[in-house]
Amino acid sequence: MGVTLMKVERPKGTRDFTPEEMRARRWLERYLLDVFRSYGYEEVLTPTFEHAKLFEEKSGEEILEEMYVFKDKKGRKLALRPEMTAPVVRFYNAELKTRPHPLKLAYIVNCFRYEQPQRGRWREFWQAGVEVFGSDRPEADVEVIELTYRIFDGILPSGAFEVRVGHLGILRGLLEEYGIGEDVQNKVAHLVDKGELDEVKTLLPAEPAEKALAVVTARSESEVEEAVSGKERAERALENLMEISDALREAGVDHELDFSVARGLDYYTGMVFEIHVPELGGGSQCAGGGRYDDLVKELGGPDVPAVGMAIGFDRLLLAAELYDRIPDGVEETRALLIPLVRSGKIWEIAAKLRKLGWVVNVEVSGKHIRKALSLADSLEYDYAVIVGERELKEGYVSVKNLKTGVQEEVPLDQLERAAEV
């Protein structure tokens, strides 16, 4: 009986990354983590899967429909994480709530949603973000937006991205004054987030629908003031937004007020913001976040205010590629070590060169020297280090500079001279 060969392809909506792509991804990871650390944020990591109920209460209808949900062998309902805020809050409630506050956390992780794959949208994707626990002051909101702005400003050219800042407390406060419950508020926010404003009229009575639409289509502070006049909670939310906006302008953060920013998650309660890169087209939103003062308590923890944001890692990388902002690579000396003899000394020589800061790739397939040198050229290496029986016996290596063609003998006890060839 013949053997049946099986062709296995990667799942739809996932990707394989080449070495060149991984260099770019690691570059962006290092950049983001350096910025996070410079602001005092400490990196955390949570499990790739959680109990599904963690997301079922507060993540919103759209995410619920897109979650990867399964049961384990004991029948427990689990889900691959579709986003990271809820897991970080769960972790905070379990182990971190006794730490000094405000507590500033950061992460870069993969998430999963069953979406229709397209440019900038995958079923496995990466998020980078921060969360601040323990401050209800506008300074915390300002820092989260300002930090995100600096990240984009440090990578993309001036004018390549837009910062839009809004406040869900205005819409929620307005609807609350009309006796509209949280469930309907969430539905309205989802409709606004998707731009389906006509549907709002079918969901709400005439007057609150008119006022809500006046808020989310407003183009100025005065238009919102008129729409929420006499609605105390909404007025306070507008004041909070203007305080945040004024501080952002003083901090040099170019932004626009956008009262239609609603986000797609049910847990947002106050300030919300998004960053868009218009040149990316339909998938232009690259970051977003906001305040979620009730989520910690709703997930079984203390009454602790919080604010955070998440960056679409893959989309930011796309934007960096679009504007040719990804560095070619770090400056390093790279060599192919070509052994012409079998000896454990080969690994000792390679180790010594690595200690000098070289990247040393040992040729392990036994290629003829001509083919090995051709390989080194194709890899665009700087040097070939040739080790044969005579070299080992006399205590030296032959070092060939692949850029100049110069080849010299370098004593084993003076390998630091190899870079001078």
UniProtKB/Swiss-Prot annotation:
EC code: 6.1.1.21
GO MF terms held by the record: ATP binding; histidine-tRNA ligase activity
Domain of life: Archaea
Keyword set, alphabetical order: Aminoacyl-tRNA synthetase, ATP-binding, Cytoplasm, Ligase, Nucleotide-binding, Protein biosynthesis
GO cellular component, one term: cytoplasm
Top-level EC class: ligase
Localisation per UniProt entry: Cytoplasm
InterPro entries tied to this protein: aa-tRNA-synth_II, aa-tRNA-synth_II/BPL/LPL, Anticodon-bd, Anticodon-bd_dom_sf, His-tRNA-ligase, HisRS-like_core, HisRS/HisZ, HisZ
CDD domains: HisRS-like_core
Reactions this protein catalyses: tRNA(His) + L-histidine + ATP = L-histidyl-tRNA(His) + AMP + diphosphate + H(+)
Swiss-Prot/TrEMBL GO biological process terms: histidyl-tRNA aminoacylation; L-histidine biosynthetic process
Family label: Belongs to the class-II aminoacyl-tRNA synthetase family.
Matching HAMAP family: His_tRNA_synth (MF_00127), HisZ (MF_00125)
Protein name: Histidine--tRNA ligase
